[in-house]
Amino acid sequence: MTGSKNKARAQAKLEKRASAQARAVAEREAANANRGAGKSRDKGKGKAGSKSDAVAEVKAGSKGKVVAETKEGARPESKALVKGTSDFNHRTENKFARSTRKDKPSSDNWFWAGEDSGINSWFWKGEELSNNSVAKCENKPSTSIQARAEEPAPRTSHKSRSGAEEEEEENVIGNWFWEGDDTGFDTDPKPVFKIVKPQPVDEINEKDRPKDWSEVTIWPKAPAVTPAVLGYRSQDSSEARSSSYIVLASNEEETSTACTKNTRSSLQSIPEYPFGSDPCIQTLDEIRQQIKIREENGIKPFACPCKLECYLDSPEFEKLVNILKSTTDPLIHKIAQIAMGIHKVHPFAQEFINEVGVVTLIESLLSFSSPEVSIKKAVITLNSSGDDRYNKVEFHVKHMCKETVSFPLNSPGQQSGLKIIGQLTTESVHHYIVVSYFSELFHLLSQGNRKTRNLVLKVFLNMSENPKAARDMINMKALAALKLIFNQKEAKANLVSAVAIFINIKEHIRKGSIVVVDHLSYNTLTAIFREVKGIIERM
């Protein structure tokens, strides 16, 4: 507020001095009648007029600035400023009253020569210091001052100019603010997110498959890992087939396959083959040569490019060829394709066919008169309900028990059947079916190898938990076979299963679930249990 006070004082001082000078000039004009006085009077009038105009202009400009600054400032300060201005006016009047008694020309020369330049320079310097921020923003102080001097600046016009300056100042500050904001922040920010790349999936590349048999090389002495040498179906449908090709599918299936290939692009959701793999048709000579290379070099069964394995040997392959030539059953041909590694299926099904033996499995299916019956025995519809499902499961259990005991001893097919029976006997509803095959199972327990005995003991352990099934296990033949398990050469898992079976039978007798009526049988049973207990303690 110091700058505003100085401006007010300077304004009052200039007004008083201008009025005093005007009165002095008027007195000189009336007193002096000569020519020199007239000239000096004319000169004084010109000077007084020009100076008074300049003072009026400065007065108007300074008043406008005072009004603009007092609007922004506080009201108590404006009151103090008015009081100080009135005091300053009284002092200046006394000074001018004394100065009029002195020499008038010297006063005029001092006022316009010295005080005018000093006051003006001091006034404009103070104004520039007080309005430094506005001058920096506008960068045109001389232009604004010149405009004020040229216009006669009434109070209303000054108010309108002040509003325009405020808008210009806001525009300048706003532009500066947003320009700074643009440099500090992104006007078009992009969203930040994590890109999840899909995991690569290994798929069969159709382009890498050989189109002709000439593109495949066969080594007579293959290394430990031999590349696949399987042939593929030719892309040309008009190509003639060799007479040594095996017909692995019926005519109807071949027709449906050709129709499906034509509509492959429009029906992607429908698989071309029911087992989910495009078959690889091979000649008999090619398959025989592959099996011969494998047997001569002693390497593992090598896979074709679609990662399917063939575990057939030469005699089994020749027998399978004769079977396929004698039947057109689609189920038999499909099983043969799986065994040859032509069709991709679930690993469990592939393992089951390899362990059972494809020739043995097909022979067992062909032993039935109707193909529909073999399909019912091989496939169980689990989504059926009621008596239909129960009858199918019962038929399946009987079929598995019959096939298992009919397989050769310790054969893969027999061991696979024992695995399935062990899973089926976890439910007591199937125990009455397995009980009828106890004599054959105890024979396998006494004559089979370690793996066969382990599988049979698992079946007996499941059935010993049922009192009705455990009652049929209490006979001399069964207990003698169980007692043979306890020797030093038996596997630990088999010993644990045998001990658990004896404990279950003992608990049923103790609880009264099994009642021994014959006294002789009871004494025999007690003697066997004491002998087994002694063997267990010694071990």
UniProtKB/Swiss-Prot annotation:
Keyword list, A-Z: Cytoplasm, Nucleus
Compartments (UniProt record): Cytoplasm; Nucleus
Domain of life per record: Eukaryota
InterPro entries according to UniProt: ARM-like, ARM-rpt_dom, ARM-type_fold, GASP1-3
Disordered: annotated segments: 1-112, 134-172
Transmembrane segments annotated in the record for this chain: none
Ranges of Basic residues composition bias in the record: 1-10
Principal subcellular localization: cytoplasm
Stretches with biased composition (Basic and acidic residues): 66-80, 88-106
Skewed-composition ranges (Polar residues): 134-146
CC annotations in GO: cytoplasm; nucleus
GO biological process: learning or memory; negative regulation of neuron apoptotic process; positive regulation of dendritic spine morphogenesis; positive regulation of neurogenesis; positive regulation of synapse assembly
Gene Ontology MF: a single term: protein homodimerization activity
One Pfam assignment: Arm_2
Quaternary structure, from the entry: Homodimer.
PANTHER family: G PROTEIN-COUPLED RECEPTOR ASSOCIATED SORTING PROTEIN 3, PROTEIN BHLHB9-RELATED
Biological role: Survival and differentiation promoting protein that plays a role in the regulation of neurosynaptogenesis. Induces phosphatase PP2A activity which results in APP dephosphorylation and inhibits BACE1-mediated processing of APP.
Family: Belongs to the GPRASP family.
Protein name per the record: G protein-coupled receptor associated sorting protein 3
